[in-house]
């Protein structure tokens, strides 16, 4: 006999039907996401009320604030449609993405004079809660009408992989 575990090796159910069956029958597989997408703050910039960021200036500062720039974007597989879905975590706190995710970067609003967020701080975009993520690939898939496979396999070769035993 053989088994093809597929995406369960990554800590996710293969489809909604199986997920519903497992939850309905109170089966605890204790799945945990094994992939976490992490970046860092490359700069913190002050924005005056009325200044805009991103393509099409879709976000405008409602008051004076600071923006942290994160060097990851849709060229890395962190897609534009994640802009309103993912809340990156810095030091355990969620921050909203400002505007649209760009090809090579995205921005988060951190608030004026926020000493909790500094250049080089670790930013957890999605993955395991143990790694500090506030959402996982299933959460993003549910919110964007896709499957976790697409979220995880979409991360491009530009993103360094670090394997942990």
Task: For each feature predicted by the language model, list its residue ranges.
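Active-site anion/phosphate-binding pocket segments in diverse small-molecule metabolic enzymes
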Residues: 1-165
